[in-house]
Curated annotation (Swiss-Prot):
Protein name (database record): Cell division protein FtsQ
Gene (UniProt): ftsQ
Major place of residence: membrane
Assigned GO CC terms: cell division site; plasma membrane
Annotated spans, Disordered: 1-24
Keyword hit for Cell cycle: yes
Topology versus the membrane: Single-pass type II membrane protein
Amino acid sequence: MAGPTTAERGARQQESSGPPRVRRFRPPRLRTIIILAVALVLVAGGTVWVLYGSNWTRLERVSVSGTDVLTPAQVREAADVPVGDPLVSVDTEAVEARLRRKLPRIDEVDVERSWPHGIGLKVTERTPVLIVQKGRNFVEVDDEGVRFATVSKAPKDVPTLELEPARSGSAAASLRRFDDDRLVREAVRVAGRLPDKVARDTRVVKVRSYDDISLELSGGRTVSWGSGEQGVRKARALTALMKATPDARHFDVSVATAPASSGS
């Protein structure tokens, strides 16, 4: 008697096997969950210990860059960074605030952690554009009109600012409206608009009122500038005027559209 054919055997196997089994999702066992939780706690605890408890990340050095007049030692002393403390606990904003308060010469400062043991202090100092004589000393004024330091020796090639506000007439009215700080800012504004050659030759910036600012140049020459307004146009007019009348002793650009020279 012949046995079942291959096709018949395949059909019976398919019938007996039935539909494919679906694997059920088995939730992780409690033991696995506990092991993972303990591992996370250990990792977190280890991280906290490394940052706060170990000697691996304690502050050991404070580096300073960008100084010119100031010394790195002065900056470190003013910063008062707590060497030996965990690096992560150093309050960088407080360090920046101390530097700005104790050293007004500093214009900008970046306080950065340098892992694993350092703090970097990158400073930018203010640069004087004018000086005000005060007794035997000199007060330095930056390009924003901030009087930031008093020095015993005048910095080289920085013009002197003379505040001589008039106390009567229209100039007195101007003084009531614009105080000394505002007049200083106007003088700085004028100094920043001068043509390069004129800036190099300027010895004194004299302010009598908001709209009465003049310059004393090398060789006894003078310039009536007026107010700080229309500075670019006045600078162009002064350049052209000096080129047209090189032997003149006085130049007036207080009205930019009507420049004049005299005293040749």
